[in-house]
């Protein structure tokens, strides 16, 4: 479900943008919040019932590794929601979806 959502939302976006998706324990999407990758701040909102959180980052130039800002946003999410699984998904028209999992 999450890979399809990443493809639908982000693959055909041609500038860096990120999205935080909150998913419950039944794999239902609870919230979706898009924001500028460079200015995440308070935009990274996580639903209180989330069992898994996906941080999606669009890389229109085809970069397969996280941007430094992706890693900063990931660390900020970890601080907000300790103990919840966070999945980083990098998307782009040329690369499709690449998922990176991080242990809790």
Predicted region positions:
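Active-site-proximal loop/helix of nucleotide/amide-processing enzymes and allied scaffolds
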Residues: 4, 10-15, 26, 35-104
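Hydrophobic "anchor" residues
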Residues: 29-30
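Short glycine-rich loop/turn motifs
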Residues: 17-20
């Amino acid at each position: 479900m999450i890979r399809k959502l990443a493809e639908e939302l982000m693959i055909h976006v041609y500038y860096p943008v990120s999205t935080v998706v909150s998913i419950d324990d039944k794999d239902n999407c609870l919230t979706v919040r898009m924001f500028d990758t460079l200015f995440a701040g308070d935009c990274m909102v996580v639903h209180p019932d989330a069992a898994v959180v996906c941080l999606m980052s669009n890389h229109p130039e085809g970069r397969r590794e996280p941007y430094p800002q992706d890693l900063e946003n990931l660390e900020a999410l970890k601080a907000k929601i300790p103990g919840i699984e966070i999945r980083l998904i990098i998307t782009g028209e040329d690369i499709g979806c690449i998922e990176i999992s991080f242990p809790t």
